[in-house]
Amino acid sequence: MTRSKSAPETTRAARQARIVAILSSAQVRSQSELAALLADEGIEVTQATLSRDLEELGAVKLRGADGGVGVYMVPEDGSPVRGVSGGTARLSRLLSELLVSADASANLAVLRTPPGAADYLASAIDRAALPYVVGTIAGDDTVFVAARDPMTGAELADTLEKLT
């Protein structure tokens, strides 16, 4: 079989790895912008393929706390980051981009996000495996974060705000 393409074909896994790397390091606002960044690396992709890749990777387009144009983000791979140098760096970045406000009650920190972003932020908090967090529950724009005793919800809210 002869190929008519001039550039070598990239495997789906390699292409998706590059997509994750790009979305982790740059604020990409559209599929066409992502396609251009991939093309700069010699990876040509159709819009349909890119759309499938983003869906398979679980990428979501979230608006920041300022309500501006959304950017694509890919959820973490599920491995905890506790004990890793700079393990909270990603959580800090997400908190600075998505945290609208923080409040507390008893042992709960109540975090407000732009609509649609709470689940993504809760997942990042869970995956950061912070020793003072028991777990999270997320709605559309609100995350309940349970503090581990003896920390209070107010102390937890303050700690999370300081990560921004």
Swiss-Prot record:
GO terms for cellular component: cytoplasm. Belongs to the ArgR family. This is Arginine repressor. Regulates arginine biosynthesis genes. The gene is argR. GO terms for molecular function: arginine binding; DNA binding; DNA-binding transcription factor activity. Keywords: Amino-acid biosynthesis, Arginine biosynthesis, Cytoplasm, DNA-binding, Repressor, Transcription, Transcription regulation. It is found in: Cytoplasm. GO terms for biological process: L-arginine biosynthetic process; protein complex oligomerization; regulation of arginine biosynthetic process.
